[in-house]
């Protein structure tokens, strides 16, 4: 029997969390909790790298499949990965240890409980990207809400309870219809096995309603306009590590869901509703970019920029073009790196000055130069400068959209200009200009842990900007197979 590497990736964070739950530091400094959680997350990252190295990129089918009977005659615990899902697993295992390192500076109370929540959340997120059964996917997908709800509600800002419940209710209500749809799929097809559903298809007459049910969940979690209003509040109140996990990983689960399920299971309905997705996506890109230009809170500005970036993602997915879908996946990976870095950059200055207002800063370039340089890099990556990972995804998406719908592509291109406007405006006001506050002179530059975390994010941001082949080679065959399956199902219908 082959080693269950995917189950190990899912279970290892849970084991680490249980160890933390049942042990205590005698001196109360939580050193054991810090080292155990970091060791657990680091080992998980190394396992995911081994998974990537041993993954056969020439095969389009799922690999490392584990299939075990769970509920007799109904549900199997079935997990596996293809070229699409493996990148999201690596992103998850890469971001998690960086979040754990960052909490030393940001979490002052109940640190052990916070680390337990992060590890549990990592387990659920990996499960989402591995799941090959609809019920298993749904359980992981919804379970991820619980630790994030606690992270915002316990360790968040003054309005944390309101923001936590808003986040929880929005995302939970959006998923009720998806649960009904999964039960309906089992009633229609007699299975919730994703691979079997790919092979046999779902009757065309049911697809529209089922697609809308899945859309109700994915649109809220992406989030797409107009379902995005929970996100700025959640980001503003969440602690820095919570914002990083929310932006870098949690939003990507919905984008992944659109690719894996909306396109894979409901091709006829996806063709019908593509104009809807295009419309909502371009509104998200342009409208939320304009809102970002009006923000005075740094976290809110970055939150609205996330909605705009995810608008590009949904646009690219529904082009059903090789470049469009590949661009969307790369954009999600890049956004995971860059948005994590931007929220960490906000966290750095907030820890020192206890303000997120842009007007509280200015002229800090000579005071904290290392911070200013790294902040500039991530600002340029967020606006899609060539040579950064942000450029590759946006460029491929726009190539795919131009092939499919010229007018939509032209409107979406405005988002590139607006993105440059709000990101450069943010950077100019925070870093350059006159020193508006004498207290800023007391700021100290990045400490060792902050410099390490931001450097870890800067390296792949630059590397994949100049050399995206490792990402493209990993996803190319799986994306091509998905498009062929999509087109064949349309022809057969």
Q: Could you say what each language-model-derived stretch is?
A:
Residues 30-42, 162-172, 368-372, 448-456:
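Alpha-helical transmembrane segments and their helix-start/interface "positive-inside/aromatic belt" motifs
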Residues 368-370, 423-493:
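Cytoplasmic/organellar membrane-interface segments at the starts of transmembrane helices
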Residues 101-117, 248, 439-449:
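Cytoplasmic juxtamembrane regions at transmembrane-helix boundaries
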């Amino acid at each position: 029997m082959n080693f269950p590497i995917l189950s190990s990736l899912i279970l290892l964070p849970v084991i680490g969390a249980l160890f933390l739950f049942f042990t205590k530091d005698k001196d109360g400094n939580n050193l054991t909790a810090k080292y155990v959680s970091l060791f657990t997350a680091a080992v998980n990252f190394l396992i995911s790298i081994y998974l990537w190295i041993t993954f056969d990129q020439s095969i389009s089918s799922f690999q490392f499949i584990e299939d075990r009977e769970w509920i007799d005659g109904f549900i199997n615990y079935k997990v596996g990965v293809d070229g699409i899902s493996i990148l999201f697993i690596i992103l998850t295992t890469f971001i998690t240890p960086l979040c754990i390192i960052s909490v030393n500076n940001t979490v002052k109370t109940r640190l052990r409980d916070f680390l337990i929540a992060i590890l549990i959340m990592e387990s659920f997120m990996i499960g989402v990207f591995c799941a090959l059964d609809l019920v298993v996917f749904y359980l992981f997908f919804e379970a991820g809400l619980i630790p994030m709800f606690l992270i915002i509600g316990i360790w968040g800002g003054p309005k944390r309870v309101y923001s936590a419940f808003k986040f929880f209710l929005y995302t939970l209500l959006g998923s009720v219809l998806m649960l009904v749809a999964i039960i309906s799929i089992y009633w229609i097809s007699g299975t919730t096995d994703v691979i079997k559903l790919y092979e046999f298809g779902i009757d065309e007459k049911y697809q529209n309603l089922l697609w809308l049910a899945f859309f109700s969940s994915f649109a809220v979690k992406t989030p797409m306009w107009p379902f995005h209003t929970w996100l700025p509040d959640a980001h503003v109140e969440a602690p820095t590590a919570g914002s990083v996990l929310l932006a870098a990983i949690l939003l990507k689960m919905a984008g992944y869901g659109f690719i894996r399920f909306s396109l894979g299971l409901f091709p006829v309905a996806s063709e019908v509703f593509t104009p809807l997705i295009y419309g909502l996506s371009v509104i998200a890109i342009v409208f939320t970019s304009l809102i970002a230009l009006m923000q005075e809170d740094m976290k809110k500005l970055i939150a609205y920029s996330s909605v705009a970036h995810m608008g590009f993602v949904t646009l690219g997915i529904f082009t059903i073009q090789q470049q469009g879908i590949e661009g969307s996946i790369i954009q999600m990976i890049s956004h995971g790196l860059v948005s994590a870095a931007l929220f960490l950059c906000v966290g750095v200055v907030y820890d020192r000055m206890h303000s997120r207002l842009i007007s509280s800063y200015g002229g800090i370039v000579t005071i904290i130069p290392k911070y200013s340089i790294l902040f500039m890099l991530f600002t340029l990556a967020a606006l899609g400068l060539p040579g950064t990972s942000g450029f590759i995804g946006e460029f491929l998406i726009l190539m795919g959209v131009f092939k499919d719908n010229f007018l939509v592509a032209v409107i979406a291109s405005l988002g590139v200009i607006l993105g440059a406007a709000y990101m450069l405006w943010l950077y100019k006001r925070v870093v350059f200009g006159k020193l508006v506050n004498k207290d800023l002179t007391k700021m100290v530059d990045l400490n060792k842990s902050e410099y390490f975390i931001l450097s870890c994010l800067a390296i792949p941001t630059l590397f994949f900007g100049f050399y995206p082949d490792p990402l493209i080679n990993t996803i190319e065959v799986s994306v091509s197979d998905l498009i062929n399956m999509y087109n064949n199902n349309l022809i057969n219908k």
